[in-house]
Amino acid sequence: ESRRGGGGPAAAAAAAGDPRGPMPGFGAPQHTIPTNVNVMQPSRVADLGALAHSAGFRIEDLANFSTNNLFNLKPNTHAYTSDPLQFGNYGKSISPTDLATTAAAAAAVTAVDPQALLQQKGVQPNLVALRTHNNDNWGESSMADTSPRTDTSTDPDIDIDERNQMFEQGQLAAPTASDSSDKSRDKLDHKSLRRLAQNREAARKSRLRKKAYIQNLESSRLKLTQLEQELQRARQQGIFISSSGDQSQSASGNGAVAFDMEYARWLEEHNKHINELRAAANAHAGDDDLRKIVDSIMSQYDEFFRLKGVAAKADVFHVLSGMWKTPAERCFMWLGGFRSSELLKLLAGQLEPLTEQQLTGICNLQQSSQQAEDALSQGMEALQQSLAETLASGSLGPAGSSGNVASYMGQMAMAMGKLGTLENFLRQADNLRLQTLQQMQRILTTRQSARALLAISDYFSRLRALSSLWLARPRE
């Protein structure tokens, strides 16, 4: 009984006999809180007072907790161990006056109305909420408050509800600061990612612009070659560059249209042989290989002049006017083709070095070609003059008379006879061109002949490209 601090007879007698009062027990007295806390045992008033004093609670607070039936404690009792260190002085005696005062305070506790205490302290009796949050944790909270190592406030003006509210606010403040920091970091990360994305997009657009610029340069460099190829494909389809009047004349006869188609096919084959000859010359092929290619190209020229003869019989004006050629080629045409003498002048600088014998042969060939061209030119002038005189002569009598009709028919018959000689002039001019090429091949070596044929092909190819560029020029 003395270890538990009880109030038995032996303890009372000891307290009465000893003037210093009873000695406090050094053991840890066990204070058992019964299930029904409204019943207070008088024998343990002193222990209850010591417990209330050590926990730092006011008497009315303890009464508030002990008398309120909303704290439905669990049936099992919780043992609270009183730490002897919470007594300031072990030698201090407890007087009977203190015991009486404590007993009176405990009796007053049992008479206090718990609802009135709650209203005085401004606490709303939200019984359901308190039971929900604090019913199960009441034992742990009481143990924490009675522990001497718990940092609790000793200010009597601050009750448990206020401390709980301050604790909850402290717990909520930390996540709020953490959330604010996380949001700030997320915002900075978002800005950095957006800036990086903008930089990548700008770099990608710059690369695309540079790539497009390089492609435009390459396409411009190859434009002349592409125009020539497009012209060749157009000729394969029978589409040729000409004015509307010339085009109508070209389509007037089946012979002219057939010749245009044959010429397009011949030009395609000719370009293939020229490319083959160029590749062989660049590869430094032997004379035998070059001779085979040169002979095939000369055979192509022979075939071309044969096709022109057939077309001249069908429509001599179509062949003579050069409607199957481009406008730039027609500008340099002479009797339906090129001038042999002018071509030899262009080749003189491409065939060097020449031996003395070769130079003499080229000069003689050029002079003979020039003389033949002059003779044919004079013949054409004479024919044109005679044809003009025939058409201009005639009677000036009244129209519709029998004499005028007969004169008209006579003039047309004479003009038709003279026009028949145009085919002869065209054939002689083509023979001169073919003979000039064949004679040049005999004067030059195989490798020189290959260079000459390549130079001729390049010359006419540039004329065709010039014509295409001229027609494609912007017009104001």
From Swiss-Prot:
Region (Disordered): 1-29, 133-159, 171-207
Stored CDD domains: bZIP_HBP1b-like
GO MF terms held by the record: DNA-binding transcription factor activity; sequence-specific DNA binding
Compartmental location: Nucleus
Major subcellular site: nucleus
Family of the protein in this entry: Belongs to the bZIP family.
Name of this chain's protein: Transcription factor HBP-1b(c1)
